[in-house]
Amino acid sequence: MRVFFIGFGQAGGKIADMFVEQDKKMAAQSFRAISVNTARTDLMGLKNIGLRDRILIGQTMVKGHGVGTDNVTGAKVTSDEIDSIINAIDSRGTHDIDAFVIIAGLGGGTGSGGSPVLARALKRIYREPVYALG
């Protein structure tokens, strides 16, 4: 099964990063992944998701410092920048995937607020199933 992981927020990004690490170790090439966050430092802490696959959103609103635990702001930033997130997903290639998996922590703001916004957009655009892991 070919899966496109979207790590959303700090927790989601770290978990997606671990999936990519395991995929590399097994040389399976079954996973594609990006990480989306409002905090620049969280994105820089990833080890296995490539730099071009780390998407910083909300720069005009939170200037790369994250939204803390404010999931309302996380949802707003995601809504405002949903087109850039979808473009990032499209540019990584989706023609051969079997499913999308959005991974997010439920205690912060970026992942818990933004992941429902992204899930709705993915379901509207693609035929592949969209799963959430929180």
Describe every region a protein language model picked out.
Residues M1-G134:
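Tubulin/FtsZ superfamily GTPase core signature
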